[in-house]
């Protein structure tokens, strides 16, 4: 790990080997919190490794020990907890937390995992080691990007300023909304890295991306709405590095990292032979994709020269006949994690919330002091 060491030699391997999936009922428990702490350490070390452009042992360890599927499962589990258990918990009469830190830890867990996945998915072998859970991850990314498009039509995430009149729980809910926005942006990067592997993805995964979710058209919507850009007091701002930053006039034509991720994903999905053979260019898809022509300026092509090929593809598409929507007669795999979690916990959301209220989210002062010392 060179000079930049957060974890001692051998410590990272122990942490990776210990990663496991938890039942939803155990979210926030002692063992779960220890794993959250481990993930934070692995996260920081992975970022240090990537920044130093040296060997990246965290990514190698996750692949070697087959832990990418575990991370995907934990990601979807905490997403489901936030959607199914958290709202029930907030409605319980007895739920009057003196301290919201233990709940913040759970809400933050999804951000921790997607951040780690974004760091390591840059490497194609990580994508391959996800095995069948790549379908679940594609679905997860699609859910996040759909919410991002929807959110861009109603003002984006709440502002960062705290209100003097907010209760701790109201502040936590605002924090969770802001975090969801950042999580969606990370999911965009993960999806782009998955499209880098389009030539080695299974037919089921390609079909999921191109037919079930029609990701090329969703990506066009993202470019149109650009939810990571906004105008405030006549000045352009972009969401970068975890907060909104005003863009200098001289930098406004410069391609943002997030716009770049969308363009690269579109390039991969529309120009790779494997994807082109699977994508049905209906009249709707043609209409959506031709909107890209207006964005393909000389300034953009100077920054991403490969997009000249995409420009040529669109010129050809403008003259091409559209295809009727067809259903491939392929025996397809389907994502299993979310459906399994739904089945295992159906009708139990209230019981899980009550259990966690008693055993997890009513900590003693000593518990709170211990948790506050951990990285978050």
Predicted regions located by residue number:
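Extended alpha-helical interaction scaffolds used for oligomerization/partner binding
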Residues: 2-375
């Amino acid at each position: 790990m060179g000079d930049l060491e957060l974890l001692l030699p051998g410590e990272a391997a122990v942490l990776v080997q210990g990663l496991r999936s938890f039942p939803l009922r155990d979210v926030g428990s002692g063992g779960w919190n220890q794993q959250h702490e481990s993930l934070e350490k692995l996260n920081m070390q992975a970022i240090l490794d990537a920044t130093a452009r040296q060997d990246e042992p965290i990514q190698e360890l996750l692949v070697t020990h087959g832990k990418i599927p575990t991370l995907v499962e934990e990601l979807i589990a905490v997403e489901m907890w936030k959607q199914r258990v958290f709202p029930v918990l907030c409605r319980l009469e007895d739920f009057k937390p003196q301290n919201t830190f233990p709940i913040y830890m759970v809400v933050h867990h999804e951000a921790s995992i997607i951040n780690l996945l974004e760091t390591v998915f840059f490497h194609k072998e990580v994508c391959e080691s996800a095995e069948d859970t790549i379908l679940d991850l594609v679905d997860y990314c699609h859910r996040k990007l759909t919410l991002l498009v929807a959110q861009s039509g109603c003002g984006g995430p709440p502002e960062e300023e705290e209100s003097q009149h907010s209760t701790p729980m109201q502040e936590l809910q605002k924090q969770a909304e802001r975090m969801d926005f950042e999580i969606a942006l990370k999911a965009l990067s993960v999806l782009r890295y998955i499209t880098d592997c389009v030539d080695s993805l299974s037919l089921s995964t390609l079909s999921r991306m191109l037919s079930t979710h029609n990701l090329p058209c969703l990506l066009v919507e993202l470019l149109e709405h650009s939810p990571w850009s906004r105008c405030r007091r006549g000045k352009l701002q972009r969401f970068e590095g975890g907060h909104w930053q005003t863009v200098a006039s001289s930098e406004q034509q410069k391609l943002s990292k997030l716009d770049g991720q969308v363009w690269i994903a579109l390039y991969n999905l529309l120009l790779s032979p494997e994807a082109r053979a699977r994508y049905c260019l209906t009249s709707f898809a043609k209409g959506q994709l031709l909107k890209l022509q207006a964005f393909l300026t000389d300034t953009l092509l100077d920054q991403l020269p490969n997009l000249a090929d995409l420009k040529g593809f669109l010129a050809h598409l403008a003259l091409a006949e559209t295809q009727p929507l067809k259903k491939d007669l392929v025996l397809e795999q389907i994502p299993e994690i979310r459906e399994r979690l739904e089945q295992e916990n159906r009708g139990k959301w209230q019981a899980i919330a009550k259990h966690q209220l008693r055993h997890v989210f009513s900590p003693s002062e000593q518990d709170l002091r211990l948790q506050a010392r951990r990285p978050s």
